[in-house]
């Protein structure tokens, strides 16, 4: 048998591997040690490399192809500092710690598997089912019911519900099904005196809150009476509750204990969107129908053909109310939009910055390299010469329209001059502009004509037929400039508002919250400068606070509303008539990539069915409406008809965990395979293997104690594991900040070329380098992008501590920072609430918030927690081969975003400054986006499986006299260290993971975590010692001492910043202040503006504290009494001397007869900028000498100053 295995089976398996696509493969540990040599010899004969590795104490053979970059050529060395050795020895010498044999026994016998009876479940307190009380509808309630579009079909709906247990009610959003259906069912059960309990399932908590509140308002009651709600952190249910709203995710968590008892009707909304938890719930409902014969299921949909749902259940009826509208809205696509804007001759944007000198481009290393790329291409003109430039455009974010510093030529100029038509087509496809002129006033067209390059002339003539340049038509680019152009088209051109003045509400659909915040600032800045008609801005996005939604619902009908929304708008039935819709037609989708084993945030075009649903929000039957889609007609025709379900593309870690808690005895792949949208089997396999890797599932696919605790924490399993390590190492606050930052957009992300407005396109490299310098400054030589998150949040937190948010604008970056920090703070609060609900944070004792943050000021402890939490995303630097190696990804590169590398800098140059070869990171596909260098001891201590025994320690093969040993942390992480060091590290590791196990298993036992409890006191000694050890290790490898990270125990941070700012500058506020009795016809060119400059003497705060509004009014009254009307605005500009700075610009107005200054913008702008602008535009220069308290200035100068404040770019003008 041995002969057959060694001579036939092993060579056959290696040949299969050689013919396959894998670059490496691990062969199972069922082979005997004697056969390892056979593997090595056969692999060597086939040109393969092999290595014996250890997995959970068992020897395995791993075989690599020559091109495989996972292979660790040699182990990384671990040498402890003297201070770490002393502290570790002192810790292990304590009598209270277990000995080596006890630790081995502990690792072998203690199971991490949670018993089925111990699995946490949520109890949904459903009162016993009974008939509702007899009551009669009031006239107002009857009018409310008859206003529903489906009221005339009530009898048909009820007959269908009695005829079949499952019905699919298919109707547009305006039918308001999730409120109407429960009321109809309740009324019927009340008349028939039958038992009823209606559970209404939404896909998000904000939808459940909104619909439940509206239903309760119908009864004139509070939530918790007839209508209730069940959410993770808010519950209102009583014995008299008959309609309960919840989310699919929360309801699933209660099924293990509740099993559809005391429910007569289940109404599931938005099934067409295929929310992953809704799809799983449908599987549970299908199984429950066999044992709950009286259960009635109503599926609410908005899709063209809902037959797939009745096919899935094998029974049911369809009520399809979606019909082709009689009057369709006018739909305009990208090409038509550009033509209309070009014909309209819209004039927007700041004049003052259009001719800004390009002094910012000088003495920049990246500019020098880009100049060399263009120069080489101009001299050679070959494909190889163009390739470095294209690399810079595609990977290092250089603009495709980059101009040579001396000649002003772009790559398009050179391609036209050299008659490289294929290069020209490629550059134009990438968004290059052929109309840019160089220093000799030549563009690509004139150069091609001058040199008689007819092939290039044909390409350019074909391109020029459109009469405009389309900047980009990719789903990952949102053209904010085009959206602003459309706003100008709608607000300032009378031909788009025929007849009586009727501006109409505007709905703008954007892919993410980040895009909402950015566009919010751009619209505000254009409105405050008087260029756009004033309006009220409202925001709707996923997981928003209810205050944002109520602000829109309660807004006056006379208010002109501009609503910026994500795709949540497809589920919100709002009583707001929209006249115009601007749809970016794209969405952000997290797609799991099987080749890199990671999720990738990818922007995609939405499907045609989603565009149709958005179009129907306009309700064309109520008047002339128009839809603008920022996608070309050709791209629209190529879109898929229906959206792909999320289960088939997303990362499945939380889904697999939810399935295992629902059905502990079912294999995850089998369960997901019978859902209505089964995911690819390879995705499920990768997710299960990953969960086993990080100890969420054990080898038998059972849920561990870690998995039990992570289920209800609203982050991915890996980020949840990082929170657990933050709790264990008592540095929770910075870990909370890092986890929350990774869950939202990065305010200091390096922007792509297309993400920069047209106005600043020439300064793309300068902007990117400025942001890079800011990241370097915030990292403070810590070689960590995660440290930037902590420091940025702390600096913002210190500025905002116990203060109301500023209700003036500074610049776009500050506005976006405040908006993103608002979202980050909200995510932090939600995570903390979930940790409390999971009993991982207590109100007192060793797990109190104060105690869990005793190490939050120590960055070395935070890095240790990052190492344990980010495992297995650990990379090793191979400086000899200038590559990064990991267990998962082969070809990996560092994204320009990370502080571990500079732009266009090879890895071997960056790695020279690295203090350690180990990197923990967050990655997307083949890019390391955020990384932190960590000491080898942290990798040895916290990576790998929690139950590693001493058996992975093997004698070193370097020499017989060598006293070092090899330690295999997992199948890839391989270290060499002295035998004494190995034993100390492994024993300390065991002691730490004993604490890890005790926390996860016993965190609900409050008595165990009292301050005077003996085992817990030992854990305090452990973390205190670890802090000293890692502090010593950081100094030993050469890390700089980090700046102190302050911990604010009870920060009172401002919330709802964007809501406050938008309300402060809203048109509704003007109406409330009795400024207007009704909207006036608006044309920005006919508004009279007066500008006064006032000498402040100090900063703005000093000026406003020293001078009352009455005094300011008297100063202005020396020239003219400030009378502010809709067509006459008074602005006050504050300035100071030494240094000469303009400080702010405010609007003088009367509120109910009282004079006040409403501050619009505040910034520090050098006076010389306006003086230079006045000279270049031949405008009389104002005097800023400080001798006069106030002065009236030319309105042209005032407009320029206004633009200086409104359109100032933080990174270009930062001083």
From Swiss-Prot:
Keyword Phosphoprotein appears in the UniProt entry: yes
Source gene?
A: bgcn
Q: Which organism is it from?
A: Drosophila melanogaster
**What does the record give as the function of this protein?**
Forms a complex with tut and bam involved in 3'UTR-dependent post-transcriptional repression of several 3'-RNA processing factors, which promotes germline stem cell lineage differentiation and mitosis-to-meiosis transition. Part of a complex with bam involved in 3'-UTR-dependent translational repression of a subset of mRNAs, including those for mei-P26, nanos and shg/E-cadherin; may act as a promiscuous RNA-binding protein tethering bam to its target mRNAs. Required for regulating the progression of gonialblast cells through transit amplification and differentiation into gametes.
What SUPFAM superfamilies is this protein classified in? Ankyrin repeat, P-loop containing nucleoside triphosphate hydrolases
| UniProt KW Phosphoprotein keyword | yes
Entry protein name? Protein benign gonial cell neoplasm
Q: Where are the ANK repeats?
A: 407-439
Q: Could you tell me which residues carry Phosphothreonine?
A: 898
PANTHER family cross-referenced by the UniProt entry: 3'-5' RNA HELICASE YTHDC2, ATP-DEPENDENT RNA HELICASE
Subunit notes for this chain? Answer: Part of a complex composed of at least mei-P26, bam, bgcn and Sxl; this complex is involved in translational repression of nanos mRNA. Interacts with bam (via C-terminus); the interaction is direct. Interacts with mei-P26; the interaction is direct and does not require bam. Weakly interacts with wh/wuho; this interaction may be required for the function or formation of the mei-P26-bgcn-bam-Sxl complex. Part of a complex composed of at least tut, bam and bgcn; complex formation does not require RNA. Interacts with tut; the interaction is indirect and is mediated by bam.
Tissues where the protein occurs = Expressed in testis and in 5-8 germline stem cells of ovaries, immediately adjacent to terminal filament. Expressed in ovarian germline cells throughout the germarium (at protein level).
GO MF terms, alphabetically ordered:
mRNA regulatory element binding translation repressor activity; RNA binding
Q: What lineage is this protein's organism placed in?
A: Eukaryota, Metazoa, Ecdysozoa, Arthropoda, Hexapoda
